[in-house]
From Swiss-Prot:
Span list, region Disordered: 1-23
Protein's UniProt name: Large ribosomal subunit protein bL33
PROSITE patterns: RIBOSOMAL_L33
Record PANTHER family: 54S RIBOSOMAL PROTEIN L39, MITOCHONDRIAL, LARGE RIBOSOMAL SUBUNIT PROTEIN BL33M
Claim: Ribosomal protein is one of the keywords in the record: yes
């Protein structure tokens, strides 16, 4: 089953993306480089809980 997650910027800007992931095939926390429009550069986004 796919679960909704939040990817939060490690730049400290407070920007985040929401996405889904399959927890059965990828049980570890996701880390991906994406564009942060507040910092205006690519930064590392880390998975956090979606409240």
């Amino acid at each position: 089953m796919r679960e909704k997650i939040k990817l939060e910027s490690s730049a400290g800007t407070g920007h985040f993306y929401t996405t889904t992931k399959n927890k059965r095939t990828m049980p570890e926390k996701m880390e991906i480089k994406k564009f942060d429009p507040v910092a205006r550069k690519h930064v590392l986004y880390k998975e956090t809980k979606l409240k």
